[in-house]
């Protein structure tokens, strides 16, 4: 018997191959979008940290040892920042820790920077 078409089994195997390939493409696209969201959040949080560091420098105040908290609007979202001074071995220098979160009581910060300032 001379068949000119595909058998049902061949069609089912071809569909399975295309379905698996489609799932792999969808998974890759989903991971890519997730990474883009993470990078956007991290970038915006870093900008908030940098804004607050510039503000701290402009005010030229010696930071205290307790946390100072506040919020800032950027890109349609409220970012919650806090900073504190940390004593160093040299009294003329102080470490400045700054954190940014997406929620006031979020467990871990989106961005954290430690820098040093002088009197």
Swiss-Prot record:
GO-annotated cellular components: plasma membrane; type II protein secretion system complex
Post-translational modification: Cleaved by prepilin peptidase.
GO biological process: protein secretion by the type II secretion system
Gene3D superfamilies in alphabetical order: GSPII I/J protein-like
Coiled coil (UniProt feature): none
Predominant subcellular localization, coarse grouping: membrane
Keywords per UniProt: Cell inner membrane, Cell membrane, Membrane, Methylation, Protein transport, Transmembrane, Transmembrane helix, Transport
Cited Pfam families: N_methyl, T2SSI
InterPro entries to which the protein is assigned, alphabetical: N_methyl_site, Pilin-like, T2SS_GspI_C, T2SS_protein-GspI
Modified residues (N-methylmethionine): 6
Membrane topology recorded in Swiss-Prot or TrEMBL: Single-pass membrane protein
Membrane-spanning segments: 6-26
Localization per record: Cell inner membrane
Residues of the propeptide: 1-5
General function of this protein: Component of the type II secretion system required for the energy-dependent secretion of extracellular factors such as proteases and toxins from the periplasm. Part of the pseudopilus tip complex that is critical for the recognition and binding of secretion substrates.
Family: Belongs to the GSP I family.
Oligomer status and interactors: Type II secretion is composed of four main components: the outer membrane complex, the inner membrane complex, the cytoplasmic secretion ATPase and the periplasm-spanning pseudopilus. Interacts with core component ExeG.
Protein name stated in the entry: Type II secretion system protein I
Organism lineage: Bacteria, Pseudomonadati, Pseudomonadota, Gammaproteobacteria, Aeromonadales
GN (gene name): exeI
